[in-house]
């Protein structure tokens, strides 16, 4: 009876929109064939309560589904009563009160039928509520479990698995793929059972009431079913491909947003946008093909449906005329079968959601079931109460799983006695850090053994083993929480006193106490609020608080400035007492006190002994020391004499300089410090309030270039909508034929109407295909456009926007993935349905008023109730959608952080802690799903039951109008079917309410992003583009605070000048504003007062793209992209195509060429996520090559050599010296030996210049610089 059902069912695209989350390439090859799990396996995480919910939900869905066919029995009997009485009411009105009063009999009969209808309505009201709410409840409970299990499974995996999988993809799986499962196991399953029950009940009623007609109709239904099956198969293939393309796009976006400073500094926005658009374009093409194939099958389905009407009416009329059936019987059979067949169409979106869920679950469950070889959650293995700490590596061979063909360790042998300190030295990439990772059992060696106290570490319990070990690595990772919490990650049950003790030992207490919120200061995303030195000291405190038996220091002091280093080194020396310590250091001055120094070369240890023994050997260590001391020799000689005088002063500088090691900023800019989550929530709520709602037309305007598609699509939709009232007219005419009259005339009329039905079928084939295709294509184009615009708008924003915690990488990636898809959910195919349904109801109402205005008015008075139910549903679901989104983002943030920094989480054995935080954040979304279940259940059941009640009212009132001669029976049928079918169609349109609610919210977010004017617009073409630039830079009384922590002053009237071709060195304690100078020069921010001038022109007046193109930057922790080495180097100049020769030349200048040539794929070698496949030194040299390729006028070196080992440092330093020739250069360095030759050295303290001059002049002043050199020379010349 309800054409819409089929249209809606077959056409409705899943609103989850086949989003991100591909299967990585390697696994995609293997999984081409089998990428669905069994249908029942999908529910493997349901407990008895869920099963009970699902069972009751299914039972009620079946009861609900049987309602319509049962109603058709009542309808058939009622039709017979009407047709039998039709002759009695063709007289004028005043005759109707005859002796027998057939009118009263008819009205009594109708009252009885009205009770039947109402009874069915009451049953449906209850059943529909239980069906929807119980299935939604069960899904919410299971999804919570799946999220927990999946996150648990990820945290459980070993490092080699992450190297191959890549972390970005896991984040998209955690959000998108699980919401796909949620789509496939919730209310849609209930709807599916409801549809199936309708199908079976319809056919059972059909067979009982008239098997001959049923068989005829079934023949065509079978063909229809077959075509649907074929279509579903084609569709799922396209969905798979589309998923993969979107996942790749998602990974590009996440990578670019995570490295936004690098992207902006090198003007890589367009390149990132192109990479992103390339994957989107693929997804769009697949989406359009999907729309074409889907809508051809849609058209065929409608052609078959109308053909079956034609056949059924023709054959049915023959049976009625030959008195085998009554007309009521024929109607019951026809409509029962029709409703049954259409219910299959209604099941389509559910059928669609199910394979999607099974596909997503295949990957998710696969990861959940993957048992790692090294399982940190396992309880198995030896758990000693304590260990002595004797370590031994015997004949250890190893290569990383992701690059199995490159051997790192080639037979390593090393013994470390309990309490000894062993230093590993050697060139970048020789296997030192690998040794440390193997000792923590992040990987297992391919051959050989590693033992502690004579026990193979594989026999220890993994967690227990790691708890004995404290690690401080070169680029320490802090989590986005408070300082105290970060230290607590070292050991869960630590007290505040122990934290303070550890912080004092790590020399971080003073700077923490100067922060406004002290230990409650938030450190920002990846610790971005703090300087490198401050992060490093907090990481040391975090390691010390574990009180580990074995301490692993991988370049633990490389990021510190001189003063901090001396003190932290002292702290580490103290921390090493009584512990077995392995130190990796490039600065050899820090390891000369080690008990044993082991020289690494090419994956084996070639020499070991104490400092003096190895110097005598004149081997690799001797060579490294020689290279290093040549730099610091000058320092130490100058100070031999003065050191004795200075000893008493202890190197304390004037102005209490040492007391003010306070770092406001750097490396990454400040993100504001907020102590408590609830304040954060208040702000997020404000953010939502500040996003102005967007009108629907504004979204459509984005699609305006596709207007021809919309015109064609809308015309077809209107034509399709008008089909239904046309159907009503023919139906009422056909019923009227069977009153008293000549059989031959009846047969002729029936034949004619059957042919009309066939004509409607041919018409609907074309209109349905065109409607679906035009809107589908426009929708795909819109999604691509929105994603592309959103990504472009994000890349356009200024740094202060990215500093805001609401715009963390995780949150932005999630937005990008879901918002555009949700907007498409309310446009595209959905728009076509709304146009079609509106036309349907509109035409229906007009015709109804013509044929019977009284009944029309009664029926129309019911429609507002249905509409109100729809609006209430929409409003409540929208509120839920908003809350859901926000709360899932909070959980997503924790997950993203844990997955991105998995090494740190694992080293700290904090997997359980992150898991419990994540689980806690899932409570909110779960509570929402419970609330939603009930609201959705109530509104759904009201809209479902209304139809039954309207049948009761309509036919009772209809009989009154017939008895009183106001209407004929066929007009009652016409009016009723036109209005009810139209209203049902509108009901279907309102079932998209949740999608529309989500879409409006997403559209509002997107438009607020598109319309945000950044303070510094990276895309701007405004400003001057000077023809030549000499390279002189002046800072004039510059005052600056970071926007997100406006109350902490950073620069307080800084003035400095560097002339063309000069090298300026900035020195000072951590946090004095050195890196801020570089960021202001790059125009990441603008000063609050004062000016920055380039060649005398104010930076604000210069075009920002031109300005950045003149600067080449190399920072302390360089970020590389997950592509080939060649592409990473070429990234330095995105304004043109860089030739391979230039890439090789830059690599040679940066001294990385020889290393690249040793790799199997040379320049085409992928560097891994954030460059993880390379050592610190290798990454740094690629970053230098990247800066040189753009031939900058000004070179900015922010700690460019701090991460390098001696040999690399010497060579890179030479490369930098060569690169500086003829260029203006600004260097930030903690190692003073690297800057002695600078033309000008400026000492910054508290945001102002305190001293400036050459190395010699500053030594003569005996001020801050003198103290710093003194301290450093002291450590170097022990």
Swiss-Prot record:
The keyword Cell division does not apply. It is a multi-pass membrane protein. It comes from Rattus norvegicus. This is Phosphatidylcholine translocator ABCB4. Residues 54-356, 710-998 form the ABC transmembrane type-1 domain. One of its GO terms (molecular function) is phosphatidylcholine floppase activity. Glycans are attached at residues 88, 94. It catalyses: ATP + H2O + phospholipidSide 1 = ADP + phosphate + phospholipidSide 2; a 1,2-diacyl-sn-glycero-3-phosphocholine(in) + ATP + H2O = a 1,2-diacyl-sn-glycero-3-phosphocholine(out) + ADP + phosphate + H(+); a 1,2-diacyl-sn-glycero-3-phosphoethanolamine(in) + ATP + H2O = a 1,2-diacyl-sn-glycero-3-phosphoethanolamine(out) + ADP + phosphate + H(+); a sphingomyelin(in) + ATP + H2O = a sphingomyelin(out) + ADP + phosphate + H(+). Expressed in the liver. Expressed in hepatocytes. The gene is Abcb4. Residues 622-646 are annotated as: Interaction with HAX1. Its EC number is 7.6.2.1. Belongs to the ABC transporter superfamily. ABCB family. Multidrug resistance exporter (TC 3.A.1.201) subfamily. SUPFAM superfamilies: ABC transporter transmembrane region (SSF90123), P-loop containing nucleoside triphosphate hydrolases (SSF52540).
């Amino acid at each position: 009876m309800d054409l819409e059902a089929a249209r809606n069912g077959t056409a409705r695209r899943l609103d989850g929109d086949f989003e991100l989350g591909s299967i990585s390439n390697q696994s995609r090859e293997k999984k081409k064939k089998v990428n669905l799990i069994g249908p029942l396996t999908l529910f493997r995480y349901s407990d008895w309560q869920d099963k009970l919910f699902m069972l009751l939900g299914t039972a009620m869905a079946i009861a609900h589904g049987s309602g319509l066919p049962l109603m058709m029995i009542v309808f058939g009997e009622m039709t017979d009563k009407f047709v039998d009485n039709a002759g009695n009411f063709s007289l004028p009105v005043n005759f109707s009160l005859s002796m027998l009063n057939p009118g009263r009999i008819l009205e009594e009969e109708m009252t009885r039928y009205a009770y039947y209808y109402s009874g069915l309505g009451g049953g449906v009201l209850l059943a529909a509520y239980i069906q929807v709410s119980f299935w939604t409840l069960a899904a919410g409970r299971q999804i919570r479990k799946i999220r927990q299990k999946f996150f648990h499974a990820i945290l459980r995996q070993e490092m080699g698995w992450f190297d191959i999988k890549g972390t970005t993809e896991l984040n998209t799986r955690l959000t998108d793929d699980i919401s796909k499962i949620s789509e496939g196991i919730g209310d849609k399953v209930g709807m599916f059972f409801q549809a199936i029950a309708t199908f079976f009940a319809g056919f059972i009623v059909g067979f009982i009431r008239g098997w001959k007609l049923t068989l005829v109709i079934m023949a065509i239904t079978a063909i229809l079913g077959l075509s649907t099956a074929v279509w579903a198969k084609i569709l799922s293939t396209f969905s798979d491909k589309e998923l993969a393309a979107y996942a790749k796009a998602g990974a590009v976006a996440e990578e670019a947003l995570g490295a936004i400073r690098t992207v902006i500094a090198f003007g890589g926005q367009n390149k990132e946008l192109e990479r992103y658009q390339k994957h989107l374009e693929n997804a769009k093409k697949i989406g359009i093909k999907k729309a074409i194939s889907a809508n051809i099958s849609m058209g065929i389905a409608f052609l078959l449906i109308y053909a079956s009407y034609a056949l059924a009416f023709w054959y049915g009329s023959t049976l009625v005329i030959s008195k085998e059936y009554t007309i009521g019987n024929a109607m019951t059979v026809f409509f029962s079968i029709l409703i049954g067949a259409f219910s299959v169409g209604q099941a389509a979106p559910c059928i669609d959601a199910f394979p999607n869920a099974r596909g997503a679950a295949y990957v998710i469950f696969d990861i959940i079931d993957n048992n790692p070889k090294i399982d940190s959650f396992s309880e198995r293995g030896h758990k000693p109460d304590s260990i002595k700490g004797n370590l031994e590596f015997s004949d250890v061979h190893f290569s990383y799983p992701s690059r199995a063909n490159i051997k790192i360790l080639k037979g390593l042998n090393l013994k470390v006695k309990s309490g000894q300190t062993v230093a590993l030295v050697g060139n970048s990439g020789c296997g030192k850090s690998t040794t440390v990772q193997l000792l923590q059992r992040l990987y297992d060696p391919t051959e050989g053994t590693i033992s502690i106290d004579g026990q193979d570490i594989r026999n220890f319990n993994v967690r227990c083993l790691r708890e004995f070990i404290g690690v401080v690595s070169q680029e320490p990772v802090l989590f986005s929480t408070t300082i105290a919490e970060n230290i607590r990650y070292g050991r869960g049950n630590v007290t505040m006193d122990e934290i303070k003790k550890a912080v004092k030992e790590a020399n971080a207490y003073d700077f923490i106490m100067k922060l406004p919120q002290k230990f409650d200061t938030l450190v920002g995303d990846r610790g971005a609020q703090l300087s490198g030195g401050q992060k490093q000291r907090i990481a040391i405190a975090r390691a010390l608080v574990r009180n580990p038996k074995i301490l692993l220091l991988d370049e633990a002091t490389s990021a510190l400035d001189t003063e901090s280093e001396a003190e932290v080194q002292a702290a580490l020396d103290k921390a090493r007492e009584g512990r077995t310590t392995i130190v990796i250091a490039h600065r050899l001055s820090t390891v000369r006190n080690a008990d044993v120094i082991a020289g690494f070369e090419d994956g084996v240890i070639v020499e070991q002994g104490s400092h003096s023994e190895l110097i005598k050997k004149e081997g690799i260590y001797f060579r490294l020391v020689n290279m290093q001391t040549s730099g610091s020799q000058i320092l130490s000689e100058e100070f031999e004499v003065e050191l004795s005088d200075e000893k008493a002063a202890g190197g304390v500088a004037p102005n209490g300089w040492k007391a003010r090691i306070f770092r406001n900023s750097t490396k990454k800019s400040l993100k504001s410090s907020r102590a408590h989550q609830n304040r954060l929530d208040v702000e997020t709520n404000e953010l939502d309030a500040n996003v102005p709602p967007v009108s629907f037309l504004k979204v459509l305007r984005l699609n305006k270039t596709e207007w021809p598609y919309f015109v064609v699509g809308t015309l077809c939709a209107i034509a399709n909508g008008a089909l239904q009232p046309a159907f009503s007219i023919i139906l009422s005419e056909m019923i009227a034929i069977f009153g008293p009259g000549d059989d031959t005339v009846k047969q002729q009329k029936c034949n004619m109407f059957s042919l009309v039905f066939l004509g409607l079928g041919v018409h609907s084939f074309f209109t349905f295909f065109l409607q679906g295709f035009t809107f589908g294509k426009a929708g795909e184009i819109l999604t691509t456009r929105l994603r592309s615009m959103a990504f472009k708008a994000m890349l356009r924003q200024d740094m202060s926007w990215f500093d805001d915690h609401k715009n963390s990488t995780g949150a932005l990636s999630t937005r990008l993935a879901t918002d555009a898809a949700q907007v498409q959910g309310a446009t595209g195919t959905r728009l076509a349905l709304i146009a079609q349904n509106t036309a349907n109801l509109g035409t229906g109402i007009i015709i109804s008023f013509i044929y019977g205005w009284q009944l029309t008015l009664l029926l129309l008075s019911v429609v507002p109730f249905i509409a109100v139910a729809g609006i209430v549903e929409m409003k409540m679901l929208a509120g839920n959608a908003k809350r859901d989104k926000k709360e899932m983002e909070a959980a997503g943030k924790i997950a993203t952080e844990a997955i991105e920094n998995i090494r740190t989480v694992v080293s700290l054995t904090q997997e359980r802690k992150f898991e419990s935080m994540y689980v806690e954040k899932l409570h909110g979304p779960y509570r929402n799903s419970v609330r939603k279940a009930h609201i959705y259940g109530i509104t759904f059941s009201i809209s479902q039951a209304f139809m039954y009640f309207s049948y009761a009212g309509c036919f009772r009132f209809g009989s009154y109008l017939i008895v009183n001669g106001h209407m004929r029976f066929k007009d009652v049928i016409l009016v009723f079917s036109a209005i009810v079918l139209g209203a049902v169609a509108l009901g279907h349109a309102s079932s998209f309410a949740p999608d529309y609610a989500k879409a409006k919210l997403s559209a509002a977010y997107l438009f607020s992003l598109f319309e945000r004017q950044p303070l510094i617009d990276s895309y701007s073409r405004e400003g001057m583009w000077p023809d030549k630039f000499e390279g002189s830079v002046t800072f004039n009384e510059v005052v600056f605070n970071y926007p997100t922590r406006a109350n902490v002053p950073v620069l307080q009237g800084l003035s400095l000048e560097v002339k063309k071709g000069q090298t300026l060195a900035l020195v000072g304690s951590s946090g004095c504003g050195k890196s801020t100078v570089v960021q202001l020069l790059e125009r990441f921010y603008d000063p609050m007062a004062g000016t920055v001038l380039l060649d005398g022109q104010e930076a604000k007046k210069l075009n920002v793209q031109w300005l950045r193109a003149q600067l080449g930057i190399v920072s302390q922790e360089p970020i590389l992209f997950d592509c080939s080495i060649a592409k990473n180097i070429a990234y330095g100049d995105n304004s043109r195509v860089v030739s391979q020769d230039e890439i090789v030349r830059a690599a040679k200048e940066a001294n990385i060429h020889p290393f690249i040539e040793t790799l199997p794929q040379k320049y085409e070698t992928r560097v891994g996520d954030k460059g993880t496949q390379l050592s610190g030194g290798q990454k740094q040299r690629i970053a230098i090559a990247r800066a040189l390729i753009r031939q900058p006028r000004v070179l900015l070196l922010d700690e460019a050599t701090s991460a390098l080992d001696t040999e690399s440092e010497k060579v890179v330093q030479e490369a930098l010296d060569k690169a500086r020739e003829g260029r203006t250069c600004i260097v930030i360095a903690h190692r003073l030996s690297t800057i002695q030759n600078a033309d000008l050295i400026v000492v910054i303290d508290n945001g102002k210049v305190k001293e400036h001059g050459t190395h010699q002049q500053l030594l003569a002043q005996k001020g801050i610089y003198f103290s710093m050199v003194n301290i450093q020379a002291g450590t170097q010349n022990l």
